[in-house]
Amino acid sequence: MSDIHSLLVAAILGVVEGLTEFLPVSSTGHMIIVGHLLGFEGDTANTFEVVIQLGSILAVVVMFWRRLFGLIGIHFGKPPAHEGQGSGRLSLIHILLGMIPAVVMGLIFHDTIKSLFNPVNVMYALIVGGVLLIAAEVLKPKQPRAVGIDDMTYRQAFVIGCFQCLALWPGFSRSGATISGGMLMGVSRYAASEFSFLLAVPMMMGATVLDVYKSIGFLNMGDVPMFAVGFVMAFIVALIAIKTFLQLIKRISFIPFAIYRFIVAAAVYVVFF
């Protein structure tokens, strides 16, 4: 690829990554389709996708930096505003409980999970994840037991972590799994989304660093500009996407996202079959 072409491809994929990483629509499904259409596939493409995820993670850190530092007892000025009706407070224990199930499952079945990265499995994951979103909207308690993120219990955090295991299935969507699990456990749509974003930082950071380490042999200095463009675009777009998403879910349900997932699944079928 020419330099200009490779930078353009990097910018497009950075936008796709940033736009879809934290929405319940599966960034994996979108990256597979767009990467295929752009002719950007193989080991370098896989490493590129892993690296630009760091841009999306950085966007969450920037958005929730005060809350993240507060979880480890570091406060700059006033503590983050209390979000809830009770007197509880989200703690690092909630995050750890939300991480444990997927970390354990991911370590045990790492090689099996990697073997699932193909269009067929992604297509089915998109469909099943869409059904789960609809089920969460239909079956969730009429009155959430955790209105704000600080109302969440340890049990709710752990069960959300169990739902996160579904995201080990490529194409399922980590945010879709965790948000659906939270809503079914009586966490409000907004609080479940916030917790999903906070949970993403250690989960994605750990997985990304591990993948980068294992892919280091496919990196070379000539790829740095392309990777940098993808990283920056993913960061900027993810920042905008997160802000917009949190405002949007105050007004609409996740049904439109579920329908969109079915459309993407159909697109995967058309493109690859």
From Swiss-Prot:
<feature type="transmembrane region" description="Helical">
    <location>
        <begin position="116"/>
        <end position="136"/>
    </location>
</feature>
<dbReference type="GO" id="GO:0005886">
    <property type="term" value="C:plasma membrane"/>
</dbReference>
<feature type="transmembrane region" description="Helical">
    <location>
        <begin position="222"/>
        <end position="242"/>
    </location>
</feature>
<protein>
    <recommendedName>
        <fullName>Undecaprenyl-diphosphatase</fullName>
        <ecNumber>3.6.1.27</ecNumber>
    </recommendedName>
</protein>
<dbReference type="Pfam" id="PF02673">
    <property type="entry name" value="BacA"/>
</dbReference>
<keyword id="KW-0378">Hydrolase</keyword>
<keyword id="KW-1003">Cell membrane</keyword>
<feature type="transmembrane region" description="Helical">
    <location>
        <begin position="190"/>
        <end position="210"/>
    </location>
</feature>
<keyword id="KW-0046">Antibiotic resistance</keyword>
<keyword id="KW-0961">Cell wall biogenesis/degradation</keyword>
<dbReference type="GO" id="GO:0050380">
    <property type="term" value="F:undecaprenyl-diphosphatase activity"/>
</dbReference>
<comment type="function">
    <text>Catalyzes the dephosphorylation of undecaprenyl diphosphate (UPP). Confers resistance to bacitracin.</text>
</comment>
<feature type="transmembrane region" description="Helical">
    <location>
        <begin position="90"/>
        <end position="110"/>
    </location>
</feature>
<keyword id="KW-0812">Transmembrane</keyword>
<dbReference type="InterPro" id="IPR003824">
    <property type="entry name" value="UppP"/>
</dbReference>
<comment type="similarity">
    <text>Belongs to the UppP family.</text>
</comment>
<feature type="transmembrane region" description="Helical">
    <location>
        <begin position="157"/>
        <end position="177"/>
    </location>
</feature>
<keyword id="KW-0133">Cell shape</keyword>
<feature type="transmembrane region" description="Helical">
    <location>
        <begin position="13"/>
        <end position="35"/>
    </location>
</feature>
<dbReference type="GO" id="GO:0071555">
    <property type="term" value="P:cell wall organization"/>
</dbReference>
<keyword id="KW-1133">Transmembrane helix</keyword>
<dbReference type="GO" id="GO:0046677">
    <property type="term" value="P:response to antibiotic"/>
</dbReference>
<dbReference type="GO" id="GO:0009252">
    <property type="term" value="P:peptidoglycan biosynthetic process"/>
</dbReference>
<dbReference type="GO" id="GO:0008360">
    <property type="term" value="P:regulation of cell shape"/>
</dbReference>
<keyword id="KW-0472">Membrane</keyword>
<feature type="transmembrane region" description="Helical">
    <location>
        <begin position="252"/>
        <end position="272"/>
    </location>
</feature>
<feature type="transmembrane region" description="Helical">
    <location>
        <begin position="45"/>
        <end position="65"/>
    </location>
</feature>
<keyword id="KW-0997">Cell inner membrane</keyword>
<keyword id="KW-0573">Peptidoglycan synthesis</keyword>
